[in-house]
Amino acid sequence: MKHGMISGATNFTYAELCRSTTADAKGLSNNPTDEVLSNLKTLAQRYLQPLRDHFGCQIIINSAYRAPMVNKAVGGAPTSWHLKGCAADIRCPSAYVAVQYANFFIDRFEKHGVGFDELFLSRSRKGGYWLHVSYSPTGDNRLRCQVMVY
């Protein structure tokens, strides 16, 4: 697996987009294929780095790529974009920040045509917030937005 910075997304590495505490804890492999690495590069270049540049602050990724066994272990959907390296769950310090990040992606679509497949603002019952952003590698993005509480 590549470990360095992602070309065109200088604040992100392949290692951080493939990191999984669940995989580590359960001894599961979370090594991506070349296709997944290519998708992660697109994710970082089109979505994560522009978000970082716009807000000028560190963007913390809770989860991006998940190998099938890792996805199953975390209770992920069997059709999750995480399996292809086309999704990231971005940690947000507050609901306000989560909404600001979501608005950023919506504005980028409206102004620049950079579409997304899913944009889910989520909150755990314990109070943590994250924003899930995904894209379709075929460009068939549904622009699906949803708010969820776990």
Protein language model features and the residues they cover:
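Extracytoplasmic cell-surface/polysaccharide-interacting catalytic and binding patches
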Residues: 1-52, 142-150
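Amphipathic alpha-helical interface surfaces
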Residues: 43-47, 70, 86, 97, ...
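Extended, low-complexity, intrinsically disordered C-terminal regulatory tails
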Residues: 46-75
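A residue-level signal for beta-strand positions that form part of recognition/binding surfaces
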Residues: 58, 87, 130
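Short, surface-exposed glycine/acidic/tryptophan-bearing loops
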Residues: 68-88
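Catalytic cores and adjacent binding grooves of peptidoglycan-active enzymes
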Residues: 79, 84, 92-150
